Regions:
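FAD-site-proximal beta/loop scaffold in flavoenzymes
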Residues: 81, 227-253, 370-446
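Beta1-alpha1 glycine-rich phosphate/pyrophosphate-binding loop at the start
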Residues: 85-170, 225, 263-264, 273-304
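FAD-binding core/adjacent interface of flavoenzyme oxidoreductases
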Residues: 39, 50, 54-61, 65-94, ...
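Short glycine-enriched, charge-decorated loop/helix-capping segments at active-site entrances
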Residues: 141-149, 226-230, 304-305, 393-395, ...
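C-terminal, flexible cofactor-proximal segment of oxidoreductases
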Residues: 55, 71-78, 83, 447-548
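A Rossmann-like FAD-binding core segment of flavoenzymes
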Residues: 164-196, 280-410, 416, 463-464
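N-terminal chloroplast transit peptides
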Residues: 1-43
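Rossmann-like NAD(P)H-binding beta-loop-alpha module
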Residues: 242-286
Length: 548
């Protein structure tokens, strides 16, 4: 079985063998059984200091875990601190896998683990932790602004997606990571991968950890950007932008109202998709201004996608400011007299608020400019969450690169941490040419397959597979009935226009997390398409009758 092919097909399960009793042993926690992997020798001491959960044992005096098997919480007792709730795994013997982050990497890893066949009693308990209660199909957030999709279609609840699986879900934010799989262990000790501290105070002890937390928008890049610009990376961001656009449209309703002005910073994929979608939505009621540091749009995109994007942006009369960077965003108030700008809200109504973007040339031959906007969207820059999750009072034990991403082996294991995997935007992994893999859904989707398989292999003492990214092409939406798709396996082929739009929706429908949700979304989209086609036919017939 080749390394490239294995994750894409259902793996052949190695011949089942009984798990040796010596691999299960009792630890100091009320006689609770934990998992022991032969490749990691156990220890509960660092030097002369006994350790529990990767911390000095004096901090904890744990009660026996609940035996009810309900996946609830039991509380450890501490002699000198307030008790912390300890997550109680339903089964005290099977391995415990904790997945942090419920995006493409985290959710699909959980579903991959659920789909594999496990010999004996080796099937792990899987716990998924995310700060939101919804999975978000981020490549289709733009369709929320155009009205093509409903929230439930691209942001289903985790509980709905996982209801037919054994995967448990907790809505919470990660506060601290304390891995212990890098420590030297003694044969007589117990073995655990470490613990995770959540913002609620809950402590999760695990045997295997998957870091799939993704990245956050870096919105504080220049003065005023954090206060006045909106990012577009989450469902909450998309709903906020939709709300702002709706309020602007309502307030400017009428022929004499000034045009709505939207400024978009950054013209990578996200910026271009936003510009095309919003410009099509506003039509003659507004203008879109797009700023980019480079002198072209989508600089990392294939030529076919880049040409299609530029064609649409120009056809929609989007104002492009290429070769500029934003140095500052500030708020002013513009009364009815356009020649008088004031900075005091008391001198002008709040409805007259305007935002000014100061642009500095990034290329020679350009002059500084000041743009006016009602709404500013920020699509450049991101930051990793891992750096702030490591203990501030201890040396960093998770290796990070200069961008705050986790350094991993080819097997997606964190370097020096054989029981910890990192995937998606959290991980720094290079392709065979030495270039960093792009931070997109396609990479995370493929890594989830490998991560799930490699956890299966590690638990069952099988060789782990090195991750190999297979670039299947790139897609982007360019409006309600327009998109561009470049397939990597057919050189020079780009599908755009309505054909590209239809192909993109079919591909994304097939990529939905579960079969049940896939069917629901497919039926919903088909019904909407039928209604749109009927409306278009009626308009065409009406126009023919009117012109005859």
């Amino acid at each position: 079985m080749s390394c490239r092919a294995a994750p894409w097909s259902r793996p052949s399960v190695p011949r089942a063998r009984s798990f040796p009793a010596s691999a299960r042993l009792r630890n100091p926690f009320g006689g609770m059984n934990v998992w022991k992997n032969p490749i990691l020798k156990s220890s509960w001491r660092i030097g002369d200091v006994p350790m529990i959960f990767g911390l000095p044992s004096g901090l904890f005096k744990c009660m026996a875990s609940s035996s009810s098997g309900d996946g609830g919480f039991s509380r450890p007792q501490s002699t000198d601190e307030a008790p912390m709730p300890l997550y109680s795994w339903p089964d005290k013997q099977r391995p415990r896998v904790c997945i942090l982050g419920g995006g493409f990497g985290g959710l699909y890893t959980a579903l991959r683990l659920e789909s594999l066949e496990w010999p004996g009693n080796n099937k792990p308990q899987v716990l998924l932790v995310d700060q939101s209660d919804r999975f978000v199909f981020k490549p289709m957030l733009y369709e929320l602004l155009s009205g093509e999709v409903d929230v439930w279609e691209i942001a289903p609840y985790f509980t709905e997606l996982l209801k037919k699986t054994s995967v448990q879900f907790i809505k919470d934010s990660v506060k601290l990571l304390r891995p212990s799989d890098h420590l030297r262990r003694e044969p007589a000790g117990s073995c655990t991968g470490g613990v995770v501290h959540l913002e609620s105070g809950t402590v999760i002890e695990y045997d295997w950890l998957v870091l799939a937390l993704g990245a956050e928008a870096k919105i504080d890049a220049v003065p005023g950007s954090a206060e006045y610009a909106l990012p577009f990376t989450t469902l909450e961001h998309a709903l906020k932008v939709e709300s702002e656009l709706t309020m602007l449209e309502r307030s400017r309703f009428g022929k004499s109202s000034p045009a709505i002005q939207v400024a978009i910073v950054g013209l990578g994929y996200s910026g271009v998709e936003l510009a095309a979608t919003i410009s099509e939505r506003l039509k003659n009621t507004g203008t879109v201004k797009a700023i980019n540091f480079q002198t072209t749009v989508c600089p990392s995109a294939p030529p076919g996608n880049r040409d299609a994007a530029l064609k649409v942006l120009e056809s929609q009369n989007i104002e492009l400011f290429l070769g500029y960077s934003v140095s500052c965003i500030r708020e002013v108030y513009a009364p009815d007299d356009p020649g008088s700008m004031v900075t005091d809200a008391e001198e002008a109504g709040s409805d007259d608020k305007k935002l000014l973007l100061e642009l500095q040339p990034a290329q020679r031959g350009l002059q500084s400019q000041v743009l006016e906007a009602d709404l500013v969207l920020w699509t450049v820059g991101s930051t990793s969450q891992i750096l702030r999750l490591q203990p501030p009072d201890a040396p960093y034990v998770i290796p990070l690169n200069g961008r705050g991403q986790v350094e991993t082996e080819e097997t997606l294991q964190v370097k020096g941490h054989p029981r910890t995997f990192a995937i998606g935007d959290s991980a720094a992994l290079r392709d065979t040419a030495g270039k960093f893999l792009p931070a997109n859904a396609q990479v995370a989707f493929q890594q989830a397959d490998f991560a799930g398989w490699n956890i299966w292999a590690a638990i069952n003492d099988r060789p782990l597979l090195p991750f190999r990214f297979q670039n299947l092409g790139e897609m982007m939406t360019l409006g309600r009935n327009d998109a561009a798709i470049t397939a990597s396996f057919i050189e020079g082929l780009t599908l755009d226009g309505p054909i590209g739009h239809a192909a993109r929706k079919v591909v994304y429908c097939l990529r939905m997390p579960t079969d049940e949700h896939r069917v629901k979304v497919g039926m919903s989209w088909f019904a909407k398409s039928a209604v749109d086609s009927l409306a278009a036919l009626q308009n065409a017939v009406s126009n023919m009758i009117a012109s005859s």
